[in-house]
Amino acid sequence: MARFLYLVRHGTADPHDGPLSQVGERQAQLTGQRLKDVPFRGIYHGPLPRAAQTATVIAASLPGVPVIACDLAGDYLPFAPDPGDLPPAFASFLAGFSAAERSEGPKLAAAAFERFARADGEQDAAEQQDAAEQQDTHELLVTHNFLIGWLVSQAMGAPPWRWLGLNQMNCGLTVIAYPPGLPAGLISFNDAGHLPPELRWTGFPAAVRPASG
């Protein structure tokens, strides 16, 4: 049966690498309420406090679902293209990353893709049991803007650098389906229907933010 990967960017944090702000906590609470009826096998989150706390708050609405820390869900550079292949603004942005970040990030991204976006026939033991019982698999990944953009770009067969510009608001919801024998499908992207207007668009670049909605 199909595998469904739910991707949520962490809630607003203040300061940037600290715990969630009050806004971020409310965003996470509403996200948990939105997802409370999904039969998740697990909630995976990156190691940074803002992702871990978002996952914990969401999990309060999903009793019994295990919460699992996962380095693959961290905040890193998923792909480092040749600057000559990029629009100038993107090339300038990527110039700020170190050689180590350019080397290690793509390794983590490749491992994350193998773990969370595997093709049909590459299931782990639990997924094989689900398949034998004709059950869809649902997993929630609480992570960061870059990795969500990377997984979406790969699902759509876009050029490897095109994770750039696929931005997520805090606690926006993206869902990718991996049906057996078929290409991945993007079910929703950056969905914020569970957030009131005053809690939307945080963390989103002002230059491409809609005027309202």
Predicted regions, residues:
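Conserved beta-strand termini and adjacent loop/short-helix elements that scaffold enzyme active sites
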Residues: 8, 70-72, 189
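Acidic, low-complexity terminal tails and accessory targeting/binding regions
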Residues: 1-2, 64, 75-85, 123-137, ...
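Internal catalytic-core helix/loop-beta-alpha segment
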Residues: 96-136
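Generic beta-sheet signal
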Residues: 5, 135-146
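Active-site signature of alpha/beta-hydrolase-fold catalytic machinery across serine-
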Residues: 57, 150, 154
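Loop-to-helix element that buttresses phosphate recognition and phosphoryl-transfer chemistry
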Residues: 3-58, 105-106, 110
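Phosphate-coordination/substrate-recognition cap region in phosphate-metabolizing enzymes
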Residues: 29-100
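Active-site metal-binding loops of divalent metal-dependent hydrolases
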Residues: 11, 145, 192
